[in-house]
Design a protein with these regions (language model features):
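Amphipathic alpha-helical scaffolding segments comprising HEAT/armadillo-like alpha-solenoid repeats
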Residues: 1-15, 37-49, 68-90, 113-125, ...
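Residue-level detector of extended alpha-helical repeat arrays and alpha-solenoid scaffolds
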Residues: 2, 21, 25, 56, ...
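Structural signature of alpha-helical solenoid repeat scaffolds
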Residues: 10, 33, 64, 108, ...
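Short inter-helical turns and helix N-cap capping residues of alpha-solenoid HEAT/ARM repeat scaffolds
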Residues: 17, 21, 51-52, 82-84, ...
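Boundary/linker elements of alpha-helical solenoid repeat scaffolds
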Residues: 22-29, 60, 100-107, 134-137
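Extended, low-complexity, acidic/polar intrinsically disordered regions
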Residues: 82, 91-98, 199-205
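Alpha-helical adaptor scaffolds
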Residues: 119, 130, 134-138
Length: 217
């Protein structure tokens, strides 16, 4: 299966890229991450340099799932450029220049808490977009274990926008930070997503109170 998925990435090197093959390739990128296909790391790192935003976004996410330490420098390069650049949007779109959420989440998932990585992530905790701030805090909480990065996430769980509340809930679950349990339980979010977040806590903790919380929903 994995060799076939890797082969499905080849059309992304064509110019122009066939739209149907592009869609297949994007699904292959996602699948390689889910399967934690370490032998796909090199190809996924190359795809981080493509002009296609969605390809960079999904490649970053999958490299995080694979925990590809060799990709750290490539991911950090996507975060570089200073405050002006990271706030810029693409012409005719609401999307930013880079898929910062998936890049930040990938660095947190890879788990290398080097000084250079921390320095690169930290400015994004002040980004104008709440979900990017959340992704940065999520990554820093994963990398450092410092609860000061959990505080902004807890606060964002009270945001007026339900989409932001949902995203932040999943971020808290992904960190495995057990003190977030009461906030997850109390959040104004549907129980189906609370279960996903609680499952994230349960996967990283042996505390049975998480299982009790899941049963109570």
């Amino acid at each position: 299966t994995i060799p076939l998925l890797i082969a499905a990435l080849d059309p992304l090197q064509e110019n122009p890229i066939n739209s149907e093959r592009r869609a297949v390739a994007l699904n292959a990128i996602r699948a390689l991450g889910i399967l934690q296909a370490t032998n796909a790391e090199e190809k996924l790192r190359i795809l981080l340099k493509k002009n296609d935003y969605s390809i960079r976004e999904e490649s970053a996410r999958s490299l995080g799932m694979i925990q590809a330490q060799a990709a750290i420098q490539d991911l950090c390069e996507l975060l570089s450029g200073g405050q002006d650049k990271v706030e810029q949007i693409q012409p005719g779109s609401a999307k930013l220049k880079e898929p910062y959420e998936s890049v930040l989440e990938a660095l947190g998932a890879i788990g290398v808490a080097s000084h250079s990585v921390i320095i690169m992530i930290t400015p994004f905790t002040k980004h104008s977009r709440p979900l990017i701030r959340a992704s940065a805090c999520r990554a820093l909480l994963q990398l450092t274990g410092d609860q000061k990065w959990a505080t902004p996430l807890i606060e964002l769980l009270k945001h007026d926008d339900p989409l932001i509340r949902r995203g932040v809930l999943l971020d808290l679950g992904a960190t495995g930070w057990m003190p977030a349990l009461p906030a997850i339980q109390a959040a104004a979010i549907e129980n189906s997503l609370k279960l996903v977040a609680l499952r994230g806590l349960a996967e990283k903790s042996e505390d049975t109170s998480v299982l009790d919380a899941m049963d109570a929903l």
